[in-house]
Amino acid sequence: MALYRSRGIVLRSIRYGEADRILDIYTRDAGLVSCIAKGIRRTRSRFGARLEPFSCVDFMAYRGRTLDTITQAESLRSFRGVRERLDRLQAAAGMAGVLHALSGGTPDRRTFNLLYRALDALEKGEEGFGMIEASFGLKLAVLSGYAPRLDGCAECGGDVPGEGARFAPAAGGFLCRDCRSDAPPDSFPVPPGTLGRLRELAALPLAEAASGRGLEEALRRVVRAHVLAHAPGAASLATPAGTAGGRP
């Protein structure tokens, strides 16, 4: 078995057997990997709390057929503040689900860096976590080649009204007045200003996403619906928000 060293962020931790955990880790150089940390739930485990969900770690592991086996782990940043507040944790879990859906196992340092910056923004912020989650999902969709259309109607390219707009996930964007009269069944109305806020989120650095106010739930719904309609791994979003980083 080949031994390797990597850096990654723990996305999910699931109990396995009497003392082990199976971890999904998004790594900087290899994308998503699934590992087993043996004995991690024992009181005197050598891993301690270094492999908690959303921790950033350097680790060593042996490659296996289905699961790699972690032998060492060093904490680089625990992001403990993300786990200590439910609203932060829910946003982080939502981001993990979107990452699973859009990136899968594909390695991309830009994705790793985006996730790290998003967790940093969640931990340092006091509010606006839904905006951070929406910004992360939107930017990751762009990186992954699944960007929604924000410059006009998804069907005809015409102007989208500020009021009475509808979002059509399968079409990949918003609908103008003419096209919304024949809107697909998956479309839904959005509050005034939703398209404008999405355009702002696309342009703003992720660290500034929480500065906006209002429309958090609408933005999260739009981004999530878009990912569900287009991402190859969208089934990972079928679980309720909050379970992606949880510890059943």
Swiss-Prot record:
Signal peptide: none annotated. Keywords: DNA damage, DNA recombination, DNA repair. The keyword DNA repair applies. InterPro entries: ARFGAP/RecO (IPR037278), DNA_rep/recomb_RecO_N (IPR022572), NA-bd_OB-fold (IPR012340), RecO (IPR003717), RecO_C (IPR042242). One of its GO terms (biological process) is DNA recombination. GO terms for cellular component: bacterial nucleoid. HAMAP family: RecO. Involved in DNA repair and RecF pathway recombination. NCBIfam families: reco (TIGR00613). Belongs to the RecO family. This is DNA repair protein RecO. It comes from Rubrobacter xylanophilus (strain DSM 9941 / JCM 11954 / NBRC 16129 / PRD-1).
